[in-house]
């Protein structure tokens, strides 16, 4: 294997040289997806002006149809993918442009997806970011108030303690797993719970899907915001983010597992 890596027999194509994938011809998967996600919405979004950043990725094909199917006045940006410009200076990993749009005062909320659209981050009308912990907290509380929450919420060891405090104040249990959506989903299934996710905006709403779906997350949050009747900034402030820092600690492979099991490390 090492010899193959050092001296590959042929040149491997990368980036834009790989080529393109043609659209599926057997039916209309875009329309089917839009119908599915729109069908999960508990309300219409009529009158809600939304800025949407598609990261020049997967949601470019669906976001406009989805938000307008729900009645939202959606302004779609970064939805011209060419196979190379995905996530370039846009999307949930580069929120600066969306934040500037929100500060203009013309939008109620901004939604940013990543390239494959499994994550969603939100920006309120003041330009402040609403990360995955805040989104999950508001949704879990809204679900409980409407009799939709099954048990509690699942986060990870990187979930901000502010979310723990927010949920505990509302008698909503929260469990933490290792980082990764597979561990979040495993815990959700084991407990029979229906919401979990990560600070990055990767949320699993298992009543509708078994993996993260940024557009589904956005639709559920926007409906919650509309039904609650409060602006995004007020909802954002409900979940206080505690000071937090993440540090990568180097360790030999032989001892990584043992180190990860130490109570002192787990608690940090």
What are these regions (language model features)?
Residues 61-65, 87-90, 120-126, 134, ...:
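Short acidic, glycine/serine/threonine-rich loops at helix termini
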Residues 52-55, 113-115, 197, 206:
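Active-site flanking residues adjacent to catalytic metal/cofactor-binding acidic residues
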Residues 1-104:
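Gly/Ser/Thr-enriched, mixed-charge loops and adjacent short helices
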Residues 71-78, 129-134, 171-179:
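Short hydrophobic/aromatic-enriched beta-strand-loop microsegments
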Residues 2, 35-38, 61-68, 96-99, ...:
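Predominant activation on well-ordered alpha-helical scaffold segments within soluble catalytic domains
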Residues 3, 109, 145-268:
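Phosphate-binding and adjacent anionic-ligand microenvironments
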Residues 28-32, 58-62, 90-93, 115-117, ...:
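Conserved active-site and cofactor/substrate-binding residues in soluble primary-metabolism enzymes
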């Amino acid at each position: 294997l090492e010899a193959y890596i050092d001296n590959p027999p042929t040149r491997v194509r990368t980036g834009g040289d790989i080529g393109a994938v043609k659209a599926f011809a057997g039916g209309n998967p875009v329309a089917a997806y839009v119908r599915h996600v729109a069908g999960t919405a508990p309300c219409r979004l009529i009158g809600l002006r939304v800025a949407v950043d598609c990261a020049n990725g997967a949601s470019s094909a669906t976001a406009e149809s989805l938000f307008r199917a729900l009645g939202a006045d959606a302004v779609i940006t970064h939805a011209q993918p060419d196979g190379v410009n995905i996530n370039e200076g846009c999307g949930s990993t580069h929120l600066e442009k969306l934040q500037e749009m929100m500060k203009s005062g013309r939008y109620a909320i901004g939604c940013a997806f990543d390239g494959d659209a499994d994550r969603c981050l939100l920006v309120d009308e003041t330009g402040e970011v609403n990360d995955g912990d805040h989104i999950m907290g508001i949704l879990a509380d809204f679900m409980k108030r409407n009799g939709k929450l099954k048990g509690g919420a699942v986060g990870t060891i990187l979930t901000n303690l502010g979310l723990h405090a927010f949920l505990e104040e509302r008698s909503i249990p929260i469990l933490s797993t290792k980082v990764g959506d597979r561990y979040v989903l495993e815990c959700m299934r084991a407990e029979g719970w229906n919401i979990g996710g990560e600070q990055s905006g990767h949320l699993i709403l298992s009543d509708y899907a078994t993996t993260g779906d940024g557009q589904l997350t956005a639709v559920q949050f926007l409906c919650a915001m509309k039904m609650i009747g409060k602006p995004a900034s007020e909802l954002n402030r409900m979940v206080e983010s505690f000071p937090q820092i993440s540090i990568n600690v180097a360790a030999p492979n032989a001892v990584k597992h043992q180190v990860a099991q130490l109570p002192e490390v787990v608690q940090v």
